[in-house]
Amino acid sequence: MKYFYSILISAFVAIALTSCLGDSDESENTYTAYGYYTITGNFNSSYTLYSDLGGKVIPTMSSVANLTDNKGFGNHSRAMLYFSYKPSQVSQDEKTITGAELFDGRYFDEYLPISKQQADDALITATDSIFQIRELNDVWAYRGYLNTVVNAPYSSVNGVNVKPTVNLVYDPASISENAITFDIYFNRHTDQNAASNGPVYFYTSHLLNFIDEIVPGNGDVTITIKTSNGISKDIKVSRQNFHKGNYE
């Protein structure tokens, strides 16, 4: 799949983010859309893509093959995907698009949040590995994932781009009833003198199923995410959204 950077989605793909590509009657028009999806299924049968804003998209397997160089989505569970469709492919309840043609996209990196002790041991919190995030563009939680979009430069060494990691780190001392704070570390895996490119957007999904066990209380949980240069965002998340649940 192509590795690219793009603007953020603002509405469910099926209705609000469309553009007409045809001039015939509406039933023959082709529309384009994109969104954030959880991927289910496999390359041997079929895939269903579940939108973070509700609804689902069932792509053609030929378009999946073309987009992924005939490899399928593999072990990837999260992606931002672009596709085209016709109105006749939308279900009457406007919740499902069948036979969509994927034509571009990028995977989310997927990580487990870790404790400060684990981060210290892995040198994630080492000062020379941490670079400033220009902007914490978006934070949201949905069905087992806490998702972040950050804008930051990245490094290159000898003309080769070095892929950074985006880690969420919690200190057990910061946990209180129905509340937890994460420090977000942007690690470029190079020293401060490495060539800098960008900035660009980085998309990450962090698994949340463990939060029920470590955050006391029974109510919605306030999650605070802080960067090393003072940017902070708070979101309130239903405990139900800490778990993926059944998609079918």
Identify the residue ranges that each predicted region occupies:
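Bacterial Sec-dependent N-terminal signal peptides
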Residues: M1-S6, S10-F43
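First exposed extracellular module after export/assembly in secreted or surface-exposed proteins
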Residues: Y31-E248
